[in-house]
Amino acid sequence: MKIVLFPGRNLSTTAIAAACDAVAGYPQRLVQRIGHPVMWIGRLTDMLDRRLNRDTDSDPVRYRNGFVAMSIIATVPCATVALVQVFAFRRLPPPLAIIAGGILGSSLSAQRSLWEHVRAVSIAARQGLPQARAAVSHIVGRDPAQLDEAAVMRAAVETLAENFSDGIVAPLLWMSLGGPAGAVFYKSVNTADSMIGHRTPRHDRFGFAAAKLDDLVNLPASRLSAVWILLAAMTMADMDARGAWRILRRDAGHHRSPNAGWPEAAMAGALGVRLSGPRSYNGVVSHEPWVGDGRADLTPHDLDRALALYRRACMLQGGVLVALSVMLRRAWRARRPS
């Protein structure tokens, strides 16, 4: 049976996914009834961690089992969704299959969720420091009890920048390459890294493969996310696009992460503030270098500006996705014999 596909169908699917996520997000009722794709991947990761990462294993065995676990995590969910994609395009009209793929793919992006969680920190900050600490504790791993208002605002802006890359740009980029299956591949790797890719006695060796693969799959999206932030800053009068470019070139590589420094540096430069710096995790102070040249004493107003920049960057990304999918469709029509 011949399969007739729209050209640029992955781009069209991705554009629909981005729009659905921005408008509706992932409904809480679905979370309560069937869970979320990330939760399912998390269960698979947890099961493999319990079965393959035994305390009695030697270091070489833990390294090996970590690679085995990542092979399963990266391929099984992706292959399952890929089979569904093939079935959909065999059985459904291409436009309907693209729409269905976009709705499915929207669950793998976090535009609306990230906006709501970071916006909650801004709202809570107007009510008091305890409320702001409680709100930011939902989105950061550091100890909120040690944070003053400026540190809470920095933590929220840093989370916004970093998660714009790995929560939105990365899954949409992988979706544009491989459809929902591509996004599932990325989310599987990213979820595994968040669960087992830590430098702890239990996961330092078993999680090595997860951490390194996550760094690799996030490499293009982290750079692209910085581009979106830079372009968004160029369209906003109260942002410093030149500063974003300067700080991006100077500080992106100074971050502890090979990827997170890119969107964070672009965000810091555009806002004219300093991000990163020393922070405390479970009572242990981590002396991280500063990113940016401006003020470190951020206010709720700075967080609101960061949210506005984030929203503009998401809009630019969505507009480019739509434009590219339309251009590919028209180019394909022009090439078809009349």
Predicted region positions:
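Solvent-exposed interhelical
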Residues: 194
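Hydrophobic alpha-helical transmembrane segments
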Residues: 1-184, 189, 197-338
